Amino acid sequence: MAPNLHIKKAFMAMRAMGIEDARVKPVLKNLLALYEKNWELIAEDNYRVLADAIFDSHEDQAIQESEEKKADEVKEDEGCAAEVDRGKKKLHESIEDDEDVMAESDRPLKRLRRRGEGGSALASPSLGSPTLEGPSINDEENAPILLPYHPVPIENDHDAGELILTKVEPITNMPLSSIPDSVDRGDSSMLEIDKSNGHVEEKAGETVSTADGTTNDISPTTVARFSDHKLAATIEEPPALELASSASGEVKINLSFAPATGGSNPHLPSMEELRRAMEEKCLRSYKILDPNFSVLGFMNDICSCYLDLATNGRDSANQLPKNLPFVTTNIDALKKSAARMAYTSQASNDVVEICSNEHMRDAENGAVGDSMALVVVPECQLSADEWRLISSVGDISLGKETVEIPWVNEVNDKVPPVFHYIAQSLVYQDAAVKFSLGNIRDDQCCSSCCGDCLAPSMACRCATAFNGFAYTVDGLLQEDFLEQCISEARDPRKQMLLYCKECPLEKAKKEVILEPCKGHLKRKAIKECWSKCGCMKNCGNRVVQQGIHNKLQVFFTPNGRGWGLRTLEKLPKGAFVCELAGEILTIPELFQRISDRPTSPVILDAYWGSEDISGDDKALSLEGTHYGNISRFINHRCLDANLIEIPVHAETTDSHYYHLAFFTTREIDAMEELTWDYGVPFNQDVFPTSPFHCQCGSDFCRVRKQISKGKNVKKRA
């Protein structure tokens, strides 16, 4: 910092105390020479050393003038004639006494230094030194000053120069800049000083005390410095509310409230009301929700952390700043800021300011710093859906899955689209999905099984009815079964297409001429034990029914593909991830919805063509735009996706409805995005799926192949 700026700050600090620049300049020069221009020592405690030096010099000057005056009078007395009669001598002695009294008045009205006290005593800079030439106090300023009338203990000498009217434990050596504006009521007596004549009178019933019941003496000059020859009013404020503290009470966070001028008596909220309001504020404004989050717990952690830093600060001085911060509410700063109206309009918009324990002094150059800016966050008006979405940060399933599935956005400030989470698919309206025990034959279930059907000792009918189990004892897909499913999905040579006589998709278009069916891919399916089976819920043949058990996370992709799903742990090959859940729509219902807004449905056509799909209520699809689960966030990847969808029968033997479960096609590392092939050909015949531009980045991307084929055709032409 430039020296001229230090000098400017010193003059400004002295002006605030009522000291003229002419008195400051010579003393400041002497201090700079004495401290070898070390501004850090001079600027400490709001230039306290400079103020003391100014008053000491003024006091010495007054004493010196008084002594010189007395010496002159003594010389005059010695030169008087010896023959002066007794009457003249008495008159001369009375005049000498009067002059002594008048000389004593030349000393500045200042707190006298006690024996053994150092030269750093603090005096008032605002009260001048009255002289015999004229009055030093205007007649208009004759309001009384209230002062305590009791002695100061000798052991408090180190605090004698500080005006501390309230005690906030455990702070000591409070600087002048942080002196409270108000004083509490106590039991000590008050003195009234009439400024017009300096007379002191005791007023009964008015007291000044500290927070712990002890009293501190305050000199008239100290009070006069802060009152500037005006009435020092004692304002009674409500007691501070203790918000939090450390375990043993060394560190505390207190909250005080100063109502606006002229306002009615406010209702001071209780701790429970404040806690509920702040937790709701955190949910609405800061978009954080953790079941274990507590505002009071957070503040207690602040106190504990502050205590740890304060007690261990010496050992880690090179790592931590010298001035450790503490948290306090600054009502005065709010009144002076532009946020005053916002604060007074709603009491819940309290603002917490971080300030320094050493009155925000810059650690490097010793300059007095400014307090940090206050920010008032406006309260957001959220809809029910937005509130539900913000509440799902820790678990987007809202507890409907067996594990928590958080969501995170590390790219921008977007949030996931609003939807209703469902763990299993639900019928929208007309879909013929009926689960009944009467439709399950005895040879289609294992009612005689108990425990785990995958145990070697079990002779399960479900295994014989569907050519063995699809799962291993570890809950993974059989290697051979998984490879067959992957080959059917990726290798056109091994794909088998089934054709309908009257395709429900073509019928739903309601065109004059019905176009022929374009074919439906036949898929292998998994048959799990169901309600009529006698095995347990944790049977090895109930993998999909047991739900999600891996750690997954919804995240915003950095490559421009929007939201995606990734795993937080390593997944083996053949592991179940989740099922595709959504609204079960008939094809006519789906086409009606497509006409209103674009959708991305999945057609349940694994058995179309092999069986007669009679009736529109049996041609079904899944649509997860408004009702769905985490599968709606899985992005597309051509051909080499790490997930594959497989039909799973779990409630009924009817082939027109089944679950669509996702399994891993290979080993997947932690934090890797999960993808599956939508099966979209990316041409004009993608109906009813909404068209989109493929951004999978795969080496086998079908869009790249179409572009390369088009280039080859142009070259041949």
From Swiss-Prot:
Residues 61-136 are annotated as: Disordered. Zn(2+) 2 binds at residues 445, 462, 529, 533. Residues 550-679 form the SET domain. Zn(2+) 1 binds at residues 445-446, 449, 453. It is found in: Nucleus; Chromosome. GO terms for biological process: gene silencing by siRNA-directed DNA methylation; methylation. Interacts with SUVR1, CHR19, CHR28 and itself. Interacts with CHR27. This is Probable inactive histone-lysine N-methyltransferase SUVR2. The gene is SUVR2.
